[in-house]
């Protein structure tokens, strides 16, 4: 990456990359890279930096090309005209493909921010660069994994970032083309069951889970069936910044609520993980079209179990990005906003958090904050219908403890080892078999 993201280069060589001395060193490094890697392309970066030397990028592009390589560069980044670069890599919402320059689309493809169940829906449904098929200007797509935070187990890269499920989702979309929208359409929310888009995702999910059981057997594959998991979610009640404030759904489940002169409805959602507001705010839609700070939502469903049984539970209310310095919740709390969970009116307590530090640092690894990074919670399901009730307050969308607040929930019953969804369960907010 050049000339930005280069503080380590400066510490090591005591020269800025854009200086004459820095450019000489870079060319020596490029010599070694080009000799070592027998690949047709080399990505040189150029994003998130102030350019102080207008000759830097053109000279580096020319040098890499002189080594027989084609050059890729970020967009946004250095601005090129056709012929001045071989390919651009679109990394943010502002990235735009340019006629005459092939582009790679990886906007919103950052696995380090993905949750377990919501983001894969958007990834699978989304057209690549909102195009039905590739062209001379749209070369394809890439998934990115920026794991800025220290890891103490390399398999955490695979399981917490959902590498294999998302890899299969993007591979199918890139191979087949198509898709139903871009990320800014329905976003992470599954469409209604009677739509072709839902049926396509359900078919993909079925085939993906076959690959989990066969092709990826023995590998960490953090995904279970979610297209059968149905919820009722209320409109959000204004809490005035009081996360503990009690609202009518805590007294009685109804289709409509009247509170302080206003009417609050209930709508259905499908999925084991639901974003009420996405990590990227309104860029990627969640359940609420216009989510507001200082509100409290409720989600509930009934789960039919064919027998009394002990099962596992995946539950989380802030999926921790792997590139952030966010602090783990305080012991006994699910998050910093006061989320709570009940099964059959019995409150489910949190696991014991293994990360207890209170100083934000990229050099301290995540603990068991994310539900797939720990053993499922052991819970009991009665024979018959079981009530699952969630309280989901939100304060501000920015807070000191977690930089990127995700107003969300993940709740699904799994086998005690976390490998599969519990068979024979029916998730129905209306108790319909």
Where are the language model's segments positioned?
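Exposed beta-strand and adjacent loop surfaces of beta-rich binding modules
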Residues: 177-180, 310, 336-338, 408
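Beta-strand-rich ligand-recognition modules
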Residues: 326-327, 332-409
